[in-house]
Amino acid sequence: FPIRKPEQIVDILKEKGLPLPTKLMLEGDELPYTEYVRLAGLFPDAEVVNGTPLIRQARSVKTAIEIEMFRRSGMAHAKAYEQIPFAYYPGMTDIEFSIEIERLMRLQGCLGIFRVFGRSMEIFMGSVLTGDNAGYPSPYDFALGGRGLDPALPGGADKTPLKEGQSVMVDLGGNFNGYMGDMSRVFSIGKLSEEAY
């Protein structure tokens, strides 16, 4: 049955002569409070329990189809990364290089958006870091930093020019067919110095 809004579920169950649930499991850790109350209110006689732990456990076990989808996602991601050295041209900034890499990813089928936790956390594709910006700390709970283009998103590329003799860290996520992966590689523009700094 096509369902446009949750309220239709009650009508369909009644129409088909099916019993209303006595126990309702909702993702209590992830649903906004108002949505939780709305859904629970559809079945006022049902016991409502937090189903998040069970749902997470079920999602942690992958079917053969899901494993194949991850494999295909990884292959598309790797295919885009193989083209990265050819996307560089002298005079580019890190943001220009990032845009070119994102273009390569999208051409391989990357969806370009990443929902990573519940309904309210999405991340950008990732970071291309070089020069002093590569050592800039992150305000977030992940390894890479960078100043970013704006305080609204303080992470990633910041228009640093790419220069001969520099390393370039490319760490982009890929969301292909709804299955996400992450890939990090370090490239160099010309020969790198033996010393890190």
Where would I find each of the regions flagged by the language model?
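Active-site neighborhoods and metal-handling regions in enzymes and metal-associated proteins
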Residues: F1-Y197
